[in-house]
Amino acid sequence: MKKMFSGVFLAFILILTSSTSYAATIQIKVDGKTIVTDANPEIKNNRTMVPLRVISENVGATVHWSDSQVTLTKNDMKVILKLKSNKVVKNGKTEYLDVKPYMKNNRTFVPMRFIAETFGSHVDYKNGIVSIGTKPFTIDGVIVSALQQEYHLFMGGVVEQSKGNGYNEAIYNTFVENKGSKVKAPANYTWDFHNVSAGDYYKNVQFDFLDQEGNSIKRFDLYSLRGLEQLEILLHEPTEGQWYLFSENAQQSIYQLLDRASMNGFVTVISNTAP
């Protein structure tokens, strides 16, 4: 009886470990950068499962939730997944996953290779490291080498560059998709912190998408109204000479994407003259 119990117990353990195991020793690298995540990847049925945000952000896909259904979009690709279902719809065509997406500790786990390759990235596994190479981000057919952001402070300023393709594309799309109504140029606007007055618009940050030679492909400047109770943000496109209303939520989304890009090692400080 004791031997029988031991055999049954061992078989039970083998079943558990073969279906799901923690991939604690596995590192995920995107374009050479080690990705930080608050939930460990898991191996389930020989598939690497990762938190949805880890993979979606790094391949530049936008996520939309509706009940237990998640929709990922990027350019002309649209993918619909459901929790606890192996059915997936890609641009209207049904396919089937080897492993169903699932929720664990308030994180949605999805098959990493499927999501990465669907959105144009290639995946390689070697020596406990999963390497994802993302598809280059382009604007009007020109490859974006970096997103440069420049801030002027009370004393000095900071210039940084982000080279994460997925993050840069998500930031660009946030600008494009959240343009409000066209407005006239403000009567007074400045980037000089010492000469801004109540009612003036101050440039908070300048975003410049650069090509491989460091030339500007597209630039966006964000201005905010100073010294008055109402919060108003304007988006300026210098090349077109056009101004738009822009939302605080969209601005915060951009800053959050930059924070996560920095956390994952994609942001480099080019210069910092602040004391």
Q: What residues fall within each predicted segment?
A:
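Primary recognition of N-terminal secretory signal peptides and signal-anchoring hydrophobic helices
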Residues: 4-7, 15-188, 202, 216, ...
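Extracytosolic low-complexity repeat regions of secreted or lipid-anchored proteins
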Residues: 206-256
